[in-house]
């Protein structure tokens, strides 16, 4: 047993989609979440800058005595997850491999689409992971640089969001039967994405798949939180406005939370 919290990092609020799923699946686990909304989105930034910022988030979580770190950000996973995983002596989980594995299981036609930030798509990491597991699977990747800002600005339910999503996804409509939401911000746009792609297209939430893998790792390393420990205090931190973060988080997660501002 290990009653220390699980650390989550993201460029902003997108990783809340992973945290929410973990809280649903493992309600007895405690989380510490840091979202770097002041510098979001990470997708358009140079790889070295993403690496620097991500290490700052990692080091912040380490000061909170976490037992595991979850990269709840596809861009950070693509750029620096392997490096962090090798250097830390606690488990470090990324969102890309779980999403890639789920896509292979879901597709019936062998045609998978991947949505992501400019950096995630440029890295080609989803194609690499999917085709390493299933070489015959065709992967069509599409950068969606306007999606994460819609979520960070709490505009993901607006008419503008619908317009942007429909225009962006047009090249993929009718081309794939499975679509990976390769950025943890994108599940907040899920209803619009589903409507744009059609009801028969399977959407893969890489963050939700990641949450399932967290449970497996906790069991493997025997670091589950004691189920008799009732004093659970989730902690949320942001580099931007706590009020803005709190508004999005509470509407998405359906719970009251306390958010603190931090400078990195």
From Swiss-Prot:
Its EC number(s): 5.1.1.3
Keyword annotations: Cell shape, Cell wall biogenesis/degradation, Isomerase, Peptidoglycan synthesis
Protein name as annotated: Glutamate racemase
The keyword Lipid metabolism appears for this protein: no
Active site per database record: 73, 183
Pathway: Cell wall biogenesis; peptidoglycan biosynthesis
Matches recorded under Pfam families: Asp_Glu_race
Binding positions (substrate): 10-11, 42-43, 74-75, 184-185
Substrates-to-products reaction catalysed: L-glutamate = D-glutamate
Record GO terms (molecular function): glutamate racemase activity
Primary role: Provides the (R)-glutamate required for cell wall biosynthesis.
Name of the encoding gene: murI
């Amino acid at each position: 047993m290990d009653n220390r919290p699980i650390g989550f990092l993201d460029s902003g609020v997108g990783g809340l989609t992973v945290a929410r799923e973990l809280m649903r699946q493992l309600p007895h686990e405690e989380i510490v979440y840091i979202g770097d909304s002041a510098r979001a989105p990470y997708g358009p930034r140079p790889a070295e800058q993403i690496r620097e910022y991500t290490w700052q988030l990692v080091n912040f979580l380490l000061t909170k005595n976490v037992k595991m770190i979850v990269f709840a950000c596809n861009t950070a996973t693509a750029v620096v997850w392997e490096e962090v995983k090798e250097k830390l002596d606690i488990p470090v989980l990324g969102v890309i491999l779980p999403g890639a594995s789920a896509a292979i299981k879901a597709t019936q036609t062998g045609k998978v689409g991947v949505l992501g930030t400019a950096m995630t798509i440029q890295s080609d990491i989803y194609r690499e992971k999917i085709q390493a597991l299933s070489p015959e699977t065709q992967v069509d990747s599409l950068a969606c640089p306007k999606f994460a800002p819609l979520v960070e600005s709490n505009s993901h339910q607006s008419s503008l969001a619908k317009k942007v999503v429909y225009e962006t996804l047009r090249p993929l409509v009718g081309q794939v039967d499975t679509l990976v939401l390769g950025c943890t911000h994108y599940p907040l746009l899920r209803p619009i994405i589903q409507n744009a792609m059609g009801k028969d297209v399977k959407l893969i939430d890489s963050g939700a798949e990641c949450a399932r893998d967290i449970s497996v790792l906790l069991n493997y390393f025997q670091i589950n939180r004691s189920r008799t420990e009732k004093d659970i205090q989730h902690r949320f931190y942001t580099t931007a406005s706590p009020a803005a973060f709190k508004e999005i988080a509470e509407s998405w997660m359906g719970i009251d939370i306390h958010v603190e501002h931090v400078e990195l």
